[in-house]
């Protein structure tokens, strides 16, 4: 009976005119600076956030709870920051530390731990739909650990959030993109891969883009874009044509596997290439047509074929020949309608009108301070 209840609720909502005008909801209003409120118990707050909390408590005649005992505080911060309890030695050291900033010292120590990135990177990996297998009935293994490790390193390195997002949406399009920035685009290679027989490749490609648009909306905007795949959204201010404007960015993506060697693999390949160079020099110095040269040439050909392979990563790459994007009637890719140019939902901050706008432009718009 759940759907009947929802239907009646929305009928009631519309009948009373409660839906309001587009853009009036607080979520679509640019954030503003608010000075911390004045509080009565001025000696309790240790930072501006405490003042907001205390002001709310005082407005309801409530008082803050007393500070917990040190051992409980230590356990809480350990579980929050790195997901692991403190060791007996860490407990002893903290209980013996009588400095006023003893707690701050623990926090700094935990933030520099590799476990911090492993703990907090998981939250992003869940949102990025990270998995080590393809999904569907075959659910074959896939190599995605390089993207996972990139997220962990970015978290531990305190990578600025705008850079964190741009590299995942369009790292391959950055000037002189590094291997790590290309690996970051694995964010949108976490889509399911259907390796079953008889698969329509174009349908699967379109389904992957649908997933990328929906994920972008949910993770970065907090909006359910998926409904606008087939029609104007019923309760979020997103039109179907706006959905396909975002679709247009991901429609220009190819999905290669790229060699991203580990340090050990890189050194192994480097040593191999050095051997090829040395053997090539011997071939060139040997007499043309001689048996010695023929033997060296055979050895060289065999050596080149034996070049060590490196780990591959699923990444995104911008197409050299752009695709035309259409709006799909009822979300059906076999029913293309009008041609759509790249763009963004009108309810959000303005985007420069340009037919040449690409995924990097979109990524920078997403991370704009507006």
Language model features: what each stretch is:
Residues 297-329:
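Coiled-coil termination/hinge junctions
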Residues 21-267, 317-336, 340-341, 360:
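Short, structured secondary-structure elements
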Residues 338-351:
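Reverse-transcriptase-like RNA-dependent polymerase core
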Residues 264-302:
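Mature extracytoplasmic enzyme cores
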Residues 216-220, 226, 349-370:
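C-terminal substrate/ligand-recognition segments
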Residues 16-20:
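Sec/Tat signal peptide C-region and signal peptidase I cleavage site
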Residues 5-15:
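Bacterial N-terminal signal peptides
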